[in-house]
UniProtKB/Swiss-Prot annotation:
This protein's encoding gene: nikC
Gene3D superfamilies in the record: MetI-like
Domain ABC transmembrane type-1: 69-258
Membrane topology: Multi-pass membrane protein
Lineage summary: Bacteria, Bacillati, Bacillota, Bacilli, Bacillales
Native organism: Staphylococcus aureus (strain MRSA252)
The protein's name: Nickel import system permease protein NikC
Compartment list: Cell membrane
């Protein structure tokens, strides 16, 4: 048991260090260098001046990856915020109000989750002009369902507990019950799901950009860089390997962090149940 939580603490440290490094590096690179074309320096090899070399337009690859992190992570955070707001709100009302609202939401979720997520995202993104902002809409439309289902499940388990019954008996406003009493109960589980989904959403954004439905040139974004590097996989593989490696490492870190948070949450719930 001690080894498990020691491992989890190490994961949390790596996660924090990764976020810290990504933030600090933003201050050492210029966004202008990520988009400025310099045809006299195309395909420069790896050096102290260009840590990962340059691309076919003479742009520094390391700079583009760091600036691309800003685009990818910002859109991911924005998407998660939209997903959580919609999903948790619907889940709270569906779990509390019951009746036709709950049935309608559940039937919609059953239909939505019966279709592969990525297929729906591609279909939705195809209706819009390719951009990162449209990816936010396309991903949010399908991903909120998991949060609604999780929230409703937790609310259902809390509804028969004495503190909720007492609040209803004393005619406490529904808004107060939802915000002050039920919302704190769902926050830990929602945070775990958010961290796990963070890696998934990065993968979705990168994949949609890779097939031309997301970020467009010259915007530095990891998926768009993969698409660009695909054409030079034989002659200059670093253009493909660099963004692919960053995507893989980022997803791995967030997935491991999500697993560690889930372990800690389950441990806390176990201790709570034993004490009650």
């Amino acid at each position: 048991m001690h080894k498990i939580f020691s491992k989890n603490n190490l994961i949390f440290f790596v996660f924090g260090a990764f976020i810290f490094v990504m933030i600090v590096l933003q201050f050492f690179v210029s966004s202008e260098n990520a988009t400025k074309v310099n045809l006299s320096q195309t395909f420069e090899p790896i050096s102290w001046l260009h840590l990962l070399g340059t691309d076919d337009y003479g742009r520094d690859l390391f700079t583009r990856i760091i600036i691309g992190a800003r685009s990818t992570l910002f859109v991911t955070v924005l998407t998660l915020i939209a997903i959580v707001v919609i999903g948790v709100t619907l889940g709270l009302f569906a779990g509390y109000k019951k009746g036709w609202i709950e049935r309608l939401v559940l039937r919609f979720i059953d239909v939505g989750l019966s279709i592969p997520e990525f297929i729906i995202m591609i279909a939705l993104a195809s209706f819009f002009q390719p951009s990162l902002w449209n990816l936010v809409i396309s991903i949010t439309v399908i991903k909120w369902m998991n949060y609604t289902r999780l929230t409703r499940s937790i609310v259902n388990s809390e509804m028969n507990k004495p503190y909720i019954k007492m609040a209803q008996l004393f005619h406490v406003p529904i808004r107060t019950i939802l915000i002050r009493h039920l919302t704190p109960k769902i926050i830990p589980a929602i945070i775990v799901l958010m961290v796990v989904d963070f890696g998934k959403i990065i993968l979705y954004i990168s994949s949609l950009s890779f097939i031309g439905l997301g970020a467009q040139p010259p915007t530095p974004e990891w998926g768009a860089m993969l698409q660009q590097g695909r054409d030079f996989i034989s002659s200059h593989p670093i253009m493909l390997i660099a963004p692919a490696s960053v995507i893989a490492i980022t997803i791995l870190i967030f997935n491991l962090t999500g697993d560690a948070l889930r372990d800690r949450l389950l441990k806390q719930r176990g201790e709570y149940n034993e004490s009650h």
